[in-house]
Design a protein with these regions (language model features):
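An anion/pyrophosphate-binding glycine-rich loop and adjacent beta-alpha core
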Residues: 1-131, 203-209
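A conserved FAD-binding loop/helix module that cradles the flavin
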Residues: 117, 166, 178-204
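Short beta-alpha connecting loops at secondary-structure transitions
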Residues: 12-17, 76, 180-189, 227-234, ...
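FAD-binding beta-loop-beta segment adjacent to the flavin cofactor pocket
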Residues: 149-170, 175-176, 184
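Long, amphipathic alpha-helical stalk/connector segments used for oligomerization, subunit docking
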Residues: 207-292
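Active-site and channel-lining beta-strand-loop segments
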Residues: 28-41, 147, 153-162
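C-terminal amphipathic alpha-helical interaction region
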Residues: 281-372
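A glycine-rich phosphate-binding loop feature that marks nucleotide/adenosyl-phosphate handling sites
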Residues: 2-12, 143-151, 213-230, 323-335
Length: 372
């Protein structure tokens, strides 16, 4: 489950994907297509019908009340629907040919708030667009589009200690399989980090304290790993890692992005195989002293592993749930998939293996908390 934030910068290319805070929409910013239409009113899912404003007048009343720190007597604007809903709606407008010049939509705060109010309430956004895109958001709309934001899955950890399946290795936060299920709510990542980061730190400290001695280090294995890491410096021919990284990014966005199909996912797996072959022969220059190209060359293997794990899991999960949307399986299947987790691991032959495992039974103390 990969979450896409609905509003990231789409232009210029050097800053594509840079996040635009939801505060812009909270302050009254509206999403419009190239025809000037507020399309979110036409994209309220059935499950949210009745909970969001159905007219611009009602949406404006809600914003004005909130900005004035008053209790609103109206429903919130549909621009504030969950991230997956807004991201899919933007994608739909772009694919229908109603997108902005650079492949996004327009986020307009200029027509809703005075320049003084925008600079006072959204100073970082004002400076971000002024400096990075030469756009004055007090007079002109922003071009925005969905950007990859958060991974809900992660490595398997013990829920109490946060220890992974590797003894002595602890994990917390986005890297760990956590509490967010298929769709994280905004702000919950911070709570996750505070609670489980504290646990991980405490148990890691206790683990270190209880150890009597360090394990012996295999010198030959260290040498082999060093040779592998330094190999890109010694190749006479090979591709630039930045080229492969960009091709990987574009392919995953296109084939394994906001909306997925079996055809696209199968094509993505074929593309990943080809990208792995290219990544195995990357060549870099310079030396080991602060060399971003070398860092990227080393990261590519991890990026490819994660990309394949996400793709294979998305192909296996024949339903739509949270941030995972299958166009060919649009419904949520609680009977089959509501009771299973998908677990990826490295098979004996080195390939990525995916299998379904039943959800563990909820501990009694948690059941009691839910009752209360």
């Amino acid at each position: 489950f990969v979450q896409f934030h609905p509003t990231g910068m789409v232009w210029p290319p050097s800053v594509k994907g840079t996040l635009i805070t939801e505060g812009v929409r909270g302050e009254g910013g509206v999403l419009k297509n190239s025809d000037g239409e507020r399309f979110m009113f036409d994209n309220i899912p059935e499950m949210f019908q009745g909970e969001y404003a159905e007219t611009e007048e009602e949406a404006t009343r809600w914003v004005n009340a909130v900005v004035a720190d008053e209790r609103p007597d109206a429903r919130r604007p549909p621009e504030l629907l969950t991230r997956d809903v807004v991201a899919r709606a933007i994608r739909r407008e772009v694919r229908a040919g109603r997108g902005s010049p650079h492949g996004g939509v327009f986020l307009d705060i200029a027509s809703k708030r005075s320049p003084e109010a925008i600079k006072r309430k959204l100073p970082s956004m004002y400076h971000q667009f002024k400096e990075l895109a030469n756009v004055d958001i007090t007079t002109d709309p922003m071009e925005v589009g969905p950007t990859c934001h958060y991974t809900m899955g992660g490595v398997r950890v013990d829920p109490d200690s946060q220890e992974t399946s590797v003894p002595g290795l602890f994990a917390a936060g986005e890297v760990a399989g956590g509490m967010h299920g298929a769709n994280r709510l905004g702000g919950n990542s911070l709570s996750d980090l505070i609670v489980f980061g504290k646990r991980a730190g405490e148990y890691a400290a206790q683990h270190a304290k209880d150890r009597e001695a360090m394990s012996d280090v295999d010198a030959e294995e260290v040498e082999r790993q060093a040779e592998t890491m330094l190999a890109p410096f010694h190749r006479e021919q090979g591709e630039n890692p930045y080229t492969i990284h960009e091709d990987l990014r574009l392919m995953m966005q296109d084939k394994v992005g906001i909306v997925r199909t079996e055809e696209d996912l199968v094509e993505a797996l074929e593309a990943l195989t080809a990208l792995r072959e290219r990544a195995a022969t990357v060549r870099i220059g310079g030396n080991i002293g602060f060399n971003p190209g070398w860092h990227l060359a080393l990261d590519l293997e991890n990026m490819l592993d994660i990309s394949e794990a996400v793709t294979r899991s998305a192909l296996m999960r024949q339903e739509s749930r949270g941030a995972h949307t299958r166009e060919d399986y649009p419904d949520t299947d609680d009977v089959t998939w509501g009771k299973q987790n998908l677990v990826t691991r490295q098979a004996e032959d080195g390939s990525v293996e995916v299998r379904a495992e039943p959800l563990p039974e909820m501990p009694e103390e948690l059941k009691e908390l839910i009752k209360d």
